[in-house]
UniProtKB/Swiss-Prot annotation:
One of its GO terms (biological process) is peptidoglycan turnover. Substrate binds at residues 69, 77, 144, 174-175. GO terms for cellular component: cytoplasm. It comes from the Bacteria. Its EC number is 3.2.1.52. It holds the Pfam family Glyco_hydro_3. The active site is at 187 (proton donor/acceptor), 258 (nucleophile). One of its GO terms (molecular function) is beta-N-acetylhexosaminidase activity. This is Beta-hexosaminidase.
Amino acid sequence: MTVPHIPRGPVMADIAAFRLTEEEKQRLLDPAIGGIILFRRNFQNIEQLKTLTAEIKALRTPELIIAVDHEGGRVQRFIEGFTRLPAMSTLGEIWDSEGAETAETHAEHIGWVLATELSACGIDLSFTPVLDLDWGNCAVIGNRSFHRNPEAVARLALALQKGLAKGGMKSCGKHFPGHGFVEGDSHLVLPEDGRSLDELEAADLAPFRIMSREGMAAVMPAHVVYPQVDTKPAGFSEIWLKQILRRDIGFKGVIFSDDLTMEGACGAGGIKERARISFEAGCDIILVCNRPDLVDELRDGFTIPDNQDLAGRWQYMENSLGHEAVQAVIQTTGFQAAQAFVAGLASPQDTAGGVKVGEAF
């Protein structure tokens, strides 16, 4: 059977379970779709995951980009057969107790293991690192954050990014310009951060600036309002995305929206209106998760925005390790030692409790 050539569209959707249904196959052939995000509900074991990703990639050319939230701690979608990754706050604790260089070395190992194991299963991208500062206010961020200190966050994220690159993956910093100061969970409410731009510049924006200079490939904005800067949430704001992120910071990479079904996005109107506002604000690619009915509503009469950079930006997010290369890495004693070391950093506190993040549960 001839594989259809369909340019990647600007929508990232999801699927229900372990295998594609015929309905999902038809949905994923729509020109509006360019990628898929997987969740825990899509994972049974490694062999099933490899079969699923191969099935997705065989649908069309260029292949759909496959992503996942696989940060470590309580946001690790695939467990059985994968190295258990520590929460990123573990690295912050090591930074404080053992020093910056030790923590950076550990962060690079985590990034390498994280990316290589996902690459071996046909995954292109993990939406990581979290660049939010841990102000002690936000339960949904909490131990997903490296540290409260902007320098520590930036340096640990850069080390993680270095490890991701060894495993064939690009980085995606989130949640611009910082979700750590607010109390609300933007999955459930629309939080407000009342600080001024100067206050944000002095702290939360610093890791994004540094990572942008050092090759961060993608950014995901927060569904948070910063009323002293703009009345719109950051992901819907031209001020935040076009003026501050693109012009002032000079970020050249991909802007992914956060999930447009989150409560923090719903106040903007129906799904078509949310999509329109996201694209006008400066998002390249939008996520619509856990609601295939909304994906179908969006697809109906969808006009692909004029974005001459879209094809190149999708291509940039492709995994850079071929199958043979990643299999060779996995067999090395050095990689296996890194797996064992990273697993030793994880703790029961990483795997149990805490706020659920982003799953339909």
